[in-house]
Curated annotation (Swiss-Prot):
Binds 1 Co(2+) ion. CDD domains: Pep_deformylase (cd00487). The lineage of its organism: Eukaryota, Metazoa, Chordata, Craniata, Vertebrata. InterPro entries: Peptide_deformylase (IPR023635), Peptide_deformylase_sf (IPR036821). SUPFAM superfamilies: Peptide deformylase. Removes the formyl group from the N-terminal Met of newly synthesized proteins. Its EC number is 3.5.1.88. The gene is PDF. Residues 1-39 form a transit peptide. It comes from Homo sapiens. One of its GO terms (molecular function) is peptide deformylase activity. This is Peptide deformylase, mitochondrial.
Amino acid sequence: MARLWGALSLWPLWAAVPWGGAAAVGVRACSSTAAPDGVEGPALRRSYWRHLRRLVLGPPEPPFSHVCQVGDPVLRGVAAPVERAQLGGPELQRLTQRLVQVMRRRRCVGLSAPQLGVPRQVLALELPEALCRECPPRQRALRQMEPFPLRVFVNPSLRVLDSRLVTFPEGCESVAGFLACVPRFQAVQISGLDPNGEQVVWQASGWAARIIQHEMDHLQGCLFIDKMDSRTFTNVYWMKVND
């Protein structure tokens, strides 16, 4: 998920536990994709009550209402195309509605289906005027940041229109709390289908082109940290930590 700032987004190990709020259960985090051997990460500790709630209600199902974080295998796989029979159907409609819902709630400017645990080629893009105005005018001009309405693409493809590389900081909701400078092409064309199967094409430059490239990368299992200048990698809270 691309952030505006950056200035750009159960497999329980069931165990018997004593009755009590302080008790905890060790579990592995869920993913819609199996993790490679040896990189599952440490078992998390879940309180007894959270464990019980999950046991009764079951684990959340994709598309999630949260954003998957780096380390989740779903972010590293290549997303599969949506089948033609699914176009205009309830499953795709639910996915696109959830993408828009989470994107707006998180106040980010782009979101891809893999970030909600669904390895399919679907993405949503939107830069509302109100969100755009939160960026200082000089910065908006420098980064060619202009608002644009909601656009949803299914099975999109990308064509570079201007291969000049422009470098600015980016963030991502799937690498929460971090920014880095990333080079992107100045102008691109994205083409694909809307959720009803109608052909859509958009030529974009500047910040909009950056957002498109960021989200298209997600469909290929690529994160901004794979393309960043590693010396610019920044924790956005570093000053707060030192305060």
